């Protein structure tokens, strides 16, 4: 695979290899055949980051080859959304001959939605001033004149200039309902929107007969907790990143959901609070003992669950675990399988044409 060529003719083969690999990894814990969810074969990534290379009068996006570290020029990127591809061309055209916008520009980040909105961040090795803002506003207006619904942001050391706003609102059809998700620049969002819809619908399906409340750790902007709220009496969710918590609170209101409570704290701190080890001011007014959480949902970082959180989740009758790294999932399952068994297993082809895969398991207490 090269940045400008996707081997779409190999899509089925690479997906089949992942299915075999996941089954092999899961063999010690389950003999289930994974439910398989396919990605679009192109234009599936909703965000992308590129370094900018200055080559005489020319200017272009580059990425670095992971093996050789050599530069690769990228003028189009079929893995990314069609809107990102349009913006890549338009941004280079708008910046190349503008000394103020071009000088010491070293990176451009793109974030887009299926609802055709975009935030583009320009990163600089220099101070940004009023002249930069004025020129950026001219560029933004020119982009909008091309029917590109875009917001521009300038970033430099200890500086962030928003021309309008630093977020966009995604709208996803999820099991018959439209869900609104505010996505903030420089915060985590699911990279493959089509796959995100399938993950949300799978999570809804595996929890459809749920009783009691749901606890979610690492909730981000509320992606899963808000979609799953319809299957539970109440949802209690934790997240550590301030911008994600603010986005989650907005999303609760935008989706008219009244049974979700978001707490800003790390999973490790929440474990201490649940076990009565420590008290936290942030939990004032929240009666943890009133929650009857029969199900816990975890979507941890690539490193998986730490040992304390492993112990905590084992206390719940049902564990829904979404993993972006099956190796750490399997490491966690060495512990979790002592008390729980795998009831459902899914493979989500979040990252086509790469070694990476995303998977989901539903575990129930033995």
Curated annotation (Swiss-Prot):
Enzyme nomenclature, EC number: 2.1.1.-, 2.1.1.35
One Pfam family matching this protein: tRNA_U5-meth_tr
GO terms for MF: rRNA binding; tRNA (uracil(54)-C5)-methyltransferase activity, S-adenosyl methionine-dependent; tRNA binding
Classification via InterPro entries: MeTrfase_TrmA_AS (IPR030390), MeTrfase_TrmA_CS (IPR030391), SAM-dependent_MTases_sf (IPR029063), TrmA_MeTrfase (IPR011869), U5_MeTrfase_fam (IPR010280)
A cellular component annotation (GO) from this entry: cytosol
Catalysis performed (reactions): uridine(54) in tRNA + S-adenosyl-L-methionine = 5-methyluridine(54) in tRNA + S-adenosyl-L-homocysteine + H(+); uridine(341) in tmRNA + S-adenosyl-L-methionine = 5-methyluridine(341) in tmRNA + S-adenosyl-L-homocysteine + H(+)
Catalytic residues (UniProt): 324 (nucleophile), 358 (proton acceptor)
Chain positions recorded as S-adenosyl-L-methionine binding sites: 190, 218, 223, 239, 299
Signal peptide: none
PROSITE patterns hit by this protein: SAM_MT_RNA_M5U (PS51687), TRMA_1 (PS01230), TRMA_2 (PS01231)
Keyword presence, Transcription regulation: no
Keywords for the protein's UniProt record, in alphabetical order: Methyltransferase, S-adenosyl-L-methionine, Transferase, tRNA processing
Entry's Gene Ontology BP terms: tRNA methylation
Main EC class the enzyme belongs to: transferase
Function: Dual-specificity methyltransferase that catalyzes the formation of 5-methyluridine at position 54 (m5U54) in all tRNAs, and that of position 341 (m5U341) in tmRNA (transfer-mRNA).
Similarity-based family: Belongs to the class I-like SAM-binding methyltransferase superfamily. RNA M5U methyltransferase family. TrmA subfamily.
Protein name: tRNA/tmRNA (uracil-C(5))-methyltransferase
Organism (species): Escherichia fergusonii (strain ATCC 35469 / DSM 13698 / CCUG 18766 / IAM 14443 / JCM 21226 / LMG 7866 / NBRC 102419 / NCTC 12128 / CDC 0568-73)
The gene coding this protein: trmA
């Amino acid at each position: 695979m090269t940045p400008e060529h996707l081997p779409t003719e190999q899509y089925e083969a690479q997906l089949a290899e992942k299915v075999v690999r996941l089954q092999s990894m899961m063999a010690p814990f389950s003999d289930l055949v994974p439910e398989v969810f396919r990605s679009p074969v192109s234009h599936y990534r909703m965000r992308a980051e590129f370094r900018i290379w200055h080559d005489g009068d020319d200017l272009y996006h580059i990425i670095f080859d992971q093996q050789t570290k050599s530069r690769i020029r990228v003028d189009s990127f079929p893995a990314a959304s069609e809107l990102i591809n349009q913006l890549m061309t338009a941004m280079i055209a708008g910046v190349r001959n503008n000394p103020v916008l071009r000088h010491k520009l070293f990176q451009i980040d793109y974030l887009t939605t299926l609802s055709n909105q975009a935030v583009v961040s320009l990163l600089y090795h220099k101070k940004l001033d009023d002249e930069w803002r004025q020129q950026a506003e001219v560029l933004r207006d020119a982009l909008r004149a091309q029917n590109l619904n875009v917001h521009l942001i300038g970033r430099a050391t200890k500086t962030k200039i928003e021309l309008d706003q630093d977020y966009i609102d995604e709208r996803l059809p999820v099991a018959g309902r439209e869900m609104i998700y505010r996505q903030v620049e420089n915060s985590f969002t699911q990279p493959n929107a089509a796959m995100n819809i399938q993950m949300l619908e799978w999570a809804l399906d595996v929890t459809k007969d749920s009783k009691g409340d749901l606890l979610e750790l690492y909730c981000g902007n509320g992606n899963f907790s808000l979609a799953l709220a319809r299957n539970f009496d109440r949802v209690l969710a934790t997240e550590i990143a301030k911008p994600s918590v603010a986005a989650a609170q907005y999303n609760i209101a935008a989706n008219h959901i009244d049974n979700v409570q978001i707490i800003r704290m790390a999973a490790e701190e929440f474990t201490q609070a649940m076990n009565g080890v420590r008290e936290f001011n942030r939990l004032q007014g929240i009666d943890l003992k009133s929650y009857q959480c029969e199900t816990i949902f975890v979507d941890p970082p690539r490193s998986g669950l730490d040992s304390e959180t492993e112990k905590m989740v084992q206390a719940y009758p049902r564990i829904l675990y979404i993993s972006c790294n099956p190796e750490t999932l399997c490491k966690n399952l060495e512990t979790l399988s002592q008390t729980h068994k795998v009831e459902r297993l899914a493979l989500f082809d979040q990252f086509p044409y790469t070694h990476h895969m995303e998977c989901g398991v539903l575990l129930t207490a033995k």
